[in-house]
Regions:
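N-terminal activation segment of mature serine protease catalytic domains
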Residues: 31-93, 100, 147-152, 255-256, ...
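Conserved active-site neighborhood of the chymotrypsin/trypsin-like protease fold
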Residues: 62-64, 76, 83-163, 185, ...
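Bacterial N-terminal signal peptides
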Residues: 14-27
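PDZ-domain C-terminal substructure recognizer with occasional recognition of PDZ-binding tails
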Residues: 114, 256-262, 290, 296-299, ...
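Short beta->alpha transition motifs characteristic of CBS
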Residues: 83, 90-96, 156, 170, ...
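Conserved PDZ fold ligand-binding element
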Residues: 85-89, 204-208, 293-316
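C-terminal cap/linker of serine protease catalytic domains
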Residues: 37-47, 135, 154, 161, ...
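Active-site region of chymotrypsin-like
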Residues: 53, 61, 65, 72, ...
Length: 362
């Protein structure tokens, strides 16, 4: 069946043309004019295909889902068609513990889908459309090849989907306060609020990232920092933007995600902590109810000094030490500071994948 081409809204075409105009500025003045025109037409078609491959995503979490407390029960965002068989890549938190998922065309039509995979380690979510979408999939590019200030396209999907031009502001490791860490995250500007699951494309229409967060400091306040802490020498002006999970993290695990629903790296220890560095020390921001940390007696405000005897000063160091320390389910020693007193707590970690609820039959 020949893929159906949806109508691109006028505003979207304006943004696509702006992207092409920005790319034109990078051309070599010695290139042949005819070759430039052919290249421009090819890129225009590729960008149109990329925009049409972005769909809306609507999900409803299962009853009593732990994630509903922070993400809500009903969620919406975007996803990108990456396979001719209806395979859609999105950001995992949209479909975490979901019992019902639908894909949304630009004209509002709904297509039922199921969750094929959720990868804790990268944050990716994988969906399978249950009926034909009639669209061309977007090819995967190389996120590592994206260079600073290169014009990029951000596209969200669904009835209110939009297209805009962005630039790569920085590429660096990112540690999330919720026991999450990825390498070489892509930070872009200007910011988009409809970032969840949105596609980040290069000028060839190749997918290079999936939208995850709105961030206050896309440039990185201090070069090389991965804990999100600013201040001190070398500080750069803050610039709001978005964080995209690079598709280079998907390529090595895609077959595994399709076969098992998660990568081997997702079977790791989980404590149920939200942490950040405050005043030079790792502090507990929140403890998930009934989590290992909650059972062990940790509370918001506790300072974490050591984990299994290893001194930690940054959030990424804390998470990586936790995951590298042994089996997902084990006894962990946390040295903490509370009310100016140092004490040691024993925490029995659990396998993160075992804590997630699934719809019946999945």
């Amino acid at each position: 069946m020949k893929p159906r081409l949806s109508t691109v809204p006028t505003v979207a075409w304006i943004m696509l043309l702006a992207l092409l105009a920005a790319w034109l500025l990078t051309w070599s003045p010695t290139a042949a004019a005819a070759d430039q025109v052919v290249d421009l037409l090819a890129r225009s078609r590729a960008l149109q295909r990329a925009q049409q491959a972005v769909l809306g995503v609507q999900a409803v979490a299962v009853e009593d889902a732990r994630s509903a407390r922070t993400l809500g029960k009903a969620r919406s965002g975007s996803g990108v068609l990456i396979g001719a068989d209806g395979l859609v890549l999105t950001i995992g938190y949209l479909v975490l513990e979901a019992e019902a998922v639908a894909l949304v065309h630009g004209d509002g039509r709904l297509v039922p889908a199921r969750v094929l995979g959720y990868d804790v380690a990268t944050g990716f979510g994988l969906l399978q459309a249950l009926t034909p979408l009639g669209l061309e999939p977007a090819p995967l590019g190389r996120s590592g090849a994206v260079v600073a200030e290169q014009p990029l396209m951000i596209a969200s999907g669904g009835g209110d989907g939009a297209v805009s031009v962005a630039q790569l502001v920085s590429r660096r490791d990112f540690a999330g306060y919720w026991e999450y860490h990825i390498e070489a995250a892509l930070f872009t500007a200007p910011p988009r609020r409809d970032h969840s699951g949105a596609g980040l494309f290069n000028s060839a229409g190749e997918l290079v990232g999936i939208g995850s967060l709105l961030v206050a400091d896309a440039a990185g306040s201090v070069e090389g920092r991965t804990d999100g802490v600013g201040g001190g020498a070398g500080q750069r002006p803050q610039r709001s933007g978005n964080l995209f999970v690079p598709v280079d993290l998907l390529t090595p695990i895609l077959a595994e995600l399709r076969a098992r629903g998660f990568s081997a790296a997702s079977r790791r220890a989980w404590l149920g902590l939200n942490c950040a560095v405050l005043d030079g020390r790792i502090r507990v921001l929140r403890v998930s109810d009934d989590s290992p940390a909650d059972v062990a007696g940790l509370v918001a405000g506790d300072g974490i000094l050591r984990i299994d005897g290893t001194e930690v000063h940054a959030v990424d160091q804390l998470w990586k030490t936790l995951w590298a320390g042994g089996a997902p389910e084990r006894e962990i020693s946390l040295e903490i500071e509370r009310d100016n007193l140092v004490q040691t707590l024993k925490v029995f970690s659990v396998d993160r994948m075992k804590t997630l609820k699934r719809a019946k039959g999945i």
